[in-house]
């Protein structure tokens, strides 16, 4: 039997996940232990520029990384996060926090989301070993031939290698 928080059944975990990494997976696993239904939503955000991975690749990587969790669903969206939260009937939006600067930006967004929709954001802190991991940094390290295999699932490491070449160990 899964321990749940109150009677909450559905949470939304939105992000670009370009690429998904071990910090994201940790947040998904914690949410999956706390809630009955976790919706991981990959955003299509043209304002962020062209992602490294296509939407389909990102969703496939998320599916592979969360295959061991039976209460995780994957979707995508290009609307406001709160609109998707309403659509999937999410009780909360879940966001991971690595460092204090994450809290500053995420709190502002959480307050705005609550103001326009009433949806509350729940923050889950990352484990210390994941606090330094960021998708942007993973892409940069991989682009210059660095090894990111300790920060991402093996499928992500393989796809990064196919895009940038094998790690040089530097």
Please identify what each model-predicted range represents:
Residues 2-170:
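Nucleotidyltransferase catalytic core that binds NTPs
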């Amino acid at each position: 039997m899964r321990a749940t928080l109150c009677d909450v059944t559905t949470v939304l975990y939105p992000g670009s996940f370009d690429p998904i990494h071990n910090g994201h997976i940790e947040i998904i696993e914690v949410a999956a232990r706390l809630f009955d239904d976790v919706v991981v939503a990959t955003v299509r955000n043209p304002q962020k520029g062209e992602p490294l991975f296509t939407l389909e690749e990102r969703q496939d990587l998320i599916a592979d990384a969360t295959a061991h969790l039976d209460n995780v669903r994957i979707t995508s969206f290009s609307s406001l996060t709160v609109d998707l939260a309403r659509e999937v009937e999410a009780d909360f939006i879940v966001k991971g926090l690595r460092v204090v600067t994450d809290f500053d930006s995420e709190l502002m967004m959480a307050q705005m989301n609550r103001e326009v929709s009433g949806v509350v954001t729940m923050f889950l802190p990352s484990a210390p070993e994941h606090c330094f991991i960021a998708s942007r940094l993973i892409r940069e390290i991989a682009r210059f031939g660095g090894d990111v295999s300790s920060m991402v699932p093996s499928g992500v490491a393989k796809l990064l290698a196919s895009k940038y070449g094998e790690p040089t160990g530097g």
